[in-house]
């Protein structure tokens, strides 16, 4: 491991040094998702692949040009990212659209238009679908593809190491901004090194640690915390794809157990998912006693999620003191504050009514989880957003951060950069847009100044959702739709309020409008609104200048003062009464799987998966169960494109008729008591990371 006197100035220098000093040591292990073997890369292997991709890039691009990365999570993604760093090309992490539908392509098209990449790095399998997108791009932005899986490793000899300095931009992280107006955070090589130092210190990473990750590589937490941190610190890393985890959450815990994972984590929903989905029969064969840093971030941390997880997995020897809270955002590279290893996450009970008025008083009603302390060489303030006054302890204000991890603004967006990255007292401060307070140096996050919604760790922007409703539901008045966060049964979800004209109210049933709104949002974002309010004309709260007041809309909905004439879930979505036809065995079998996963009593042929309460996590689990039970090749994309029971069953029937078998699932090897690791096993632990989300609560 490198000490303070050996710190590299770039991640390129870090990997090159390891490739020279310990070339055969395992750098990464990717777990196989079928009956094939996983992929392991030594430092020599990764360096060779990075140099070959860099050489190919240098033949087509100049220092500072951009390259978009479009891969599933896996070895190609990693090699391509380092290839960009090696070439001095600015990497733009992204992900292939979930389907060919317009909604799923919009974000990628917006990123391409904003970043103006010289190349798109991908694999041969994705070449044709990506080339079809050129019809939606201008000639200047037409995709030029480089399939990295077809490169000859010998081209690495042509690599010419560029003069990359710490202030040069390493990559653009598109994690903030709406679909229509994306904002690419400019993260420099120096930012990366500074933040990796913080993560190593904060987590207390040592030579005996093993990092296990399922987080997406296109997301800052998965990329910087899951992939780059183990390479920077020289510790083993085990990676699996997010899909592999979501299909069966127990796989995450099995990997920690099998490979001796000590550092791993994810958003709050990952812990809830394990509590809900892992069978009791699995608890005794999983050993989580070595898991020392179970970090939680990327969305609000809920005490009940942690308590349920700790209670259930006590049988697997999980220690609740391993929970570790972290807060951060892409504009600060990733990590801003964190707890203390082995100390758990302190909770603070406060008066709910006082908190709603941004005051802190101990009492009942709300429980806030401590997000740790600021890190060395970095500073934090709580500031009154209106006056700019710095606030003392127990005063709620906007969280500001400063230090060498703070990014270099937004790509070619001076206006947004000036609003978010401000000068004060001779240094640059990041206005996070999050609300919180300090108590004895510890940070508590209470909410957001921004209107952004965070659902299952993913950022959803209200402007995007509002545009979707307005374009797909003509009866909703243009400019009179508001999307906002709601909390139902302890989980954050989407709320929609839409003004409906008097004439439409008379001619179109309220239930039909509600169903149309929920279906439009569900198909675009794989998450149906938990609340829909149909409003009378003029009822939507606005400022004197005509701007939507989304927070006021939510508050009025909560206190009952919103002028609505129909409300979901006061109205329930209409479901057809008849069950699937008895003579259609396939429809019935798939219907039973839907009912079990969605927790509904019945499902009809034309019922829509996402309107029944499904989301992207449930979709992954349904696809996996159908694939395994019927032995058919099936992909998540096929449920997104055919979201009704009837349409999805027809898709499955076509796959069966074509005789496309599923890849055989990985054989499960029974394990008894876990044995101590030998020296060879410890070397084997040189492993990896993987898989989704953005700005607010990393």
Residue ranges and their predicted role:
Residues 566-694:
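Regions immediately C-terminal to embedded phosphopantetheine-bearing carrier domains
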Residues 261-265, 277-365, 379, 387-389:
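Gly/Ser/Thr-rich phosphate-binding loop
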Residues 193-210, 220-262, 277-282:
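Conserved AMP-binding/adenylation subdomain of ANL enzymes
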Residues 24-82, 98-109, 158-163, 184-191:
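Conserved AMP-binding/adenylate-forming core of the ANL superfamily
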Residues 23-26, 145-146, 153-174, 180-181, ...:
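Conserved pre-ATP/AMP-binding loop-to-beta segment of ANL
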Residues 120, 257, 264, 403, ...:
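AMP-binding/adenylate-forming catalytic core of the ANL superfamily
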Residues 369-379, 386-394, 398-459, 610:
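Conserved ATP-binding/catalytic segment of the ANL
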Residues 8, 479-480, 487, 492, ...:
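AMP-binding/adenylate-forming catalytic domain of the ANL superfamily
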């Amino acid at each position: 491991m490198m000490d303070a006197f050996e710190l590299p100035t770039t991640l390129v220098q870090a990997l090159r040094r390891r490739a020279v000093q310990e070339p055969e040591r395992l750098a990464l292990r990717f777990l196989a998702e079928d009956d094939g073997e996983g992929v392991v890369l030594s430092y020599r292997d990764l360096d060779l692949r990075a140099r070959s991709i860099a050489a190919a890039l240098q033949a087509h691009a100049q220092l500072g040009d951009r390259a978009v990365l479009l891969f599933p999570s896996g070895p190609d993604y990693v090699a391509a990212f380092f290839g960009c760093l090696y070439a001095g090309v600015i990497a733009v992490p992204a992900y292939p659209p979930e389907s060919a539908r317009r909604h799923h392509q919009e974000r990628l098209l917006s990123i391409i238009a904003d970043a103006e990449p010289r190349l798109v790095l991908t694999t041969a399998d994705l070449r044709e679908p990506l080339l079809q997108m050129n019809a939606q791009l201008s000639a200047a932005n037409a995709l030029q593809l480089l399939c990295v899986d077809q490169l000859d490793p010998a081209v690495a000899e042509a690599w010419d190491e560029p003069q990359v300095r710490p202030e040069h931009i390493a990559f653009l992280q598109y994690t903030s901004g709406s679909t229509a107006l994306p904002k690419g955070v400019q993260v420099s090589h120096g930012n990366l090194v500074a933040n990796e130092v913080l993560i190593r210190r904060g987590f207390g990473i040592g030579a005996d640690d093993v990092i296990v990750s399922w987080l997406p590589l296109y997301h800052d937490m998965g990329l910087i915390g899951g992939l780059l941190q183990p390479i920077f610190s020289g510790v083993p890393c085990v990676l699996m794809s997010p899909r592999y985890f979501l299909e069966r959450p127990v796989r995450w815990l099995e990997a920690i157990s099998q490979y001796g994972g000590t550092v791993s984590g994810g958003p709050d929903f990952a812990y809830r998912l394990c509590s809900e989905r892992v069978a009791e029969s699995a608890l005794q064969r999983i050993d989580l006693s070595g898991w020392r840093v179970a970090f939680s971030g990327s969305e609000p941390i809920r005490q009940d999620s942690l308590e349920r997880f700790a209670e259930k997995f006590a049988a697997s020897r999980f220690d609740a003191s391993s929970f570790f809270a972290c807060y951060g955002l892409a504009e600060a590279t990733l990590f801003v504050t964190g707890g203390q290893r082995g100390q758990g996450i302190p909770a603070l009970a406060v008066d709910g009514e006082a908190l709603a008025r941004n005051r802190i008083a101990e009492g009942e009603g709300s429980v806030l989880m401590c997000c740790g302390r600021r890190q060395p060489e970095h500073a934090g303030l709580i500031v009154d957003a209106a006056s700019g006054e710095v606030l003392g302890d127990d005063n709620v204000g906007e969280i500001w951060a400063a230090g060498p991890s703070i990014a270099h603004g937004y790509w070619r967006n001076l206006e947004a950069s000036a609003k978010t990255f401000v000068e004060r007292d001779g240094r640059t401060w990041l206005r996070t847009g999050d609300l919180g307070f300090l108590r004895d140096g510890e940070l508590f996050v209470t909410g957001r100044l921004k209107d952004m919604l965070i659902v299952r760790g993913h950022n959803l922007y209200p402007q995007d959702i509002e545009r979707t409703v307005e374009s797909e539901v003509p009866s909703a008045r243009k400019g009179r739709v508001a999307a906002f966060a709601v909390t139902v049964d302890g989980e954050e979800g989407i709320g929609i309020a839409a003004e409906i004209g008097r004439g439409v109210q008379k001619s179109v049933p309220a239930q039909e409008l509600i169903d149309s709104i929920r279906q439009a949002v569900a198909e675009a974002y794989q998450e149906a609104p938990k609340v829909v309010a149909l409003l009378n004309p003029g009822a939507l709260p606005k400022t004197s200048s005509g701007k939507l007041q989304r927070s006021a809309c939510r508050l009025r909905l909560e206190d009952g003062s919103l002028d609505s004439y129909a409300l979901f879930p006061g109205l329930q979505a209409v479901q057809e009464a008849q069950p699937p036809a008895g003579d259609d065995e396939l429809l019935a079998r798939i219907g039973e799987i839907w009912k079990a996963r969605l927790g509904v009593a019945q499902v009809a042929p034309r019922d829509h998966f996402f309107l029944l309460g499904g989301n992207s996590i449930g979709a992954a689990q349904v696809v996996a169960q159908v694939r395994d039970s019927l032995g058919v090749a099936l992909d998540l994309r096929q449920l997104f494109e055919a979201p009704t029971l009837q349409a999805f069953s027809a898709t499955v029937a076509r796959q069966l008729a074509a005789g496309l078998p599923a890849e055989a699932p990985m054989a499960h090897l029974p394990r008894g008591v876990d044995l101590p690791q030998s020296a060879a096993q410890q070397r084997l632990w040189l492993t990896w990371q993987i898989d989704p989300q953005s700005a607010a609560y990393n």
